Design a protein with these regions (language model features):
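Alpha-helical transmembrane segments and their helix-helix packing motifs
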Residues: 2-279
Length: 279
């Protein structure tokens, strides 16, 4: 009688333990990137997230939709940024919080991780500022009867008129969603898998108004430039769109993002799937 071998189809996505292992490997790669390459990839990520932010503010300039629908669809527009980061390849500070998995498994050192974080944070900011320059020179803010410019000021002003602690906790919530989106994207085996997996977590954090430090590297300078050009004069809090206001927001959002991504997501999943049992 002939022997029949039963072949089972490969799973459509990685299991959580395999995602953690892949995340550790990615952390090692990130930690060993030459500074110039890491910085350039970080600039790409800052630019990509800025593209998502631009798409978001252009959409928000149309006030015909109700508040809830506008936030949800605007969040879907913003997804463009992380889709470009994951599919095209770039170094995003918030996603790099997951390097803690590699750190805890002693595959990289604390110095390597912190160095990578600093290089990527600065690179993200430079990339975002470059897009602010391009958007200004291209006159995108003049669209929809200059309503886009007012939308840019409104979004930015809303981020500098809340207290530091609130921004910090919104930053924690934000990077929980972002790192889970990256986690899902890592699980996917095709471009479609990655894109679909990203949509809901990213749309949710944007719709809820959480604080993403890299997105704010675009939103805040863009709003400040528009306010300096005379737009959004009647927007509450617009006068706080200056260097101090930007630093105030980014300090809280950055620290909150680190706690949300590195401590709550990365450390949690490392403990579950990679921590060695003690005899």
């Amino acid at each position: 009688m002939a022997d029949f071998k039963v072949e089972y189809p490969a799973p459509y996505c990685l299991a959580p333990a395999a995602i953690e292992a892949k995340t550790e490997a990615a952390g090692v790669t990130k930690a060993n990137l030459p500074v110039a390459k890491a910085f350039l990839l970080a600039m790409f990520a800052g630019a990509f997230i800025a593209f998502g932010g631009l798409f978001f503010t252009v959409f928000l300039s149309d006030s015909t939709l109700g508040w809830g629908a506008q936030r949800v669809v605007g969040g879907l527009c913003f997804c463009l940024g992380l889709v470009l980061v994951l599919v095209c390849g770039a170094e995003l500070f918030t996603g790099n919080s997951l390097m803690v998995c590699a750190l805890k498994s002693k595959k990289i050192t604390l110095v390597q991780m912190l160095k990578a974080w600093v290089v990527v944070w600065v690179g993200n900011f430079v990339g975002a500022l470059f897009i602010v320059f391009l958007v200004y020179m291209a006159g995108i803010y003049k669209l929809n009867g200059e309503a886009v410019a007012n939308s840019m000021v409104s979004v930015a002003a809303g981020k500098v008129t809340i207290d530091w602690v609130t921004i910090f906790f919104r930053g924690i919530l934000c990077n929980i969603f972002v790192c889970l989106a990256v986690w899902i994207g890592t699980a996917g085996k095709t471009v479609v898998d990655k894109v679909v997996g990203i949509l809901l977590p990213i749309a949710a954090f944007v719709a809820c108004g959480f604080e993403h430090c890299v997105a704010n590297m675009y939103f805040l300078p863009m709003g400040a430039v528009m306010h300096a050009c005379g737009y959004g004069a009647k927007v509450a809090g617009a006068d706080a769109l200056n260097a101090a206001g930007i630093a105030f927001n980014l300090s809280a959002a950055t620290l909150g993002n680190i706690v949300g991504g590195a401590v709550l997501v990365a450390l949690g999943y490392w403990f579950i799937y990679a921590k060695k049992s003690e005899a």
